[in-house]
Amino acid sequence: MNPVYVVTDIEVNGPTPGEHSMLAFASVALDVAGGEIDTFEAVLETLPEAGEDPITIKWFKGFPEAWAAATTNPDPPHAVMKRYVEWVRGLPGQAVFAAHPLAFDGAWIDHYLRRFCGIRMLKGPWEGERLFHTAGLCLQAIAAGRTGWDFAACFTGAYPPEWLGHVPHSHLSIDDARGYANLLRTLLHMKAPGTRA
């Protein structure tokens, strides 16, 4: 297997795929050594039948630059997801989805892939195509395993800035994806507690 890690961050206007909309997302593709291969980023039109969560919107508007980036010049979701599928399939290896945490970002990407492209994100015993190889990587879980920290203690503000490549966690999807890509690079080269040199 020649994996390419597709580290992804999303921005949304509420917690529930379908009831709310994904506003923007970005992916950074890394090779097994942690070298950056390529990036993808997009801003999406909101789903016509979906609403927005007032608490999420209030929080998001506390980051005006990120809010503007996630809502300016959006493209139709079907066009974005088609481009994304083509981009992932064009990567030089087996694409492995990665996110922090996997359960949140992965659920949104899966929902949009199924709705607009008719394919699933992850491999499993389901009918139809899958875009990514294996079950995906949860960077939060990997961080807990590598560091020995409690899972709940593994969050962006707890990591040393150099682990994130000194990329600010700005809530711009490309910034956050790049920071998490740096985190994965760090974790790939880190030994877990108690392992032999």
Residue ranges of each PLM-predicted region?
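Substrate-recognition/cap helix-loop segment adjacent to the acidic, metal-dependent catalytic center
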Residues: 103-134
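Glycine-rich, phosphate-binding/catalytic loops in enzymes
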Residues: 22-26, 113-117, 191
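Generic detector of well-ordered alpha-helical packing
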Residues: 10-12, 106, 139, 177
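Amphipathic alpha-helical interface surfaces
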Residues: 77-84, 105-112, 135-139
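Conserved non-catalytic scaffold segment of RNase H-like nuclease domains
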Residues: 2-6, 11-102
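Active-site-proximal helix-loop-helix substrate-binding element of RNase H-like nuclease domains
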Residues: 46-49, 57, 136-177
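Acidic, Mg2+-coordinating catalytic module of metal-dependent nucleases/exonucleases
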Residues: 96-102, 107-108, 154-197
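A short, structured active-site edge motif that brings together acidic residues
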Residues: 42-45, 123-143
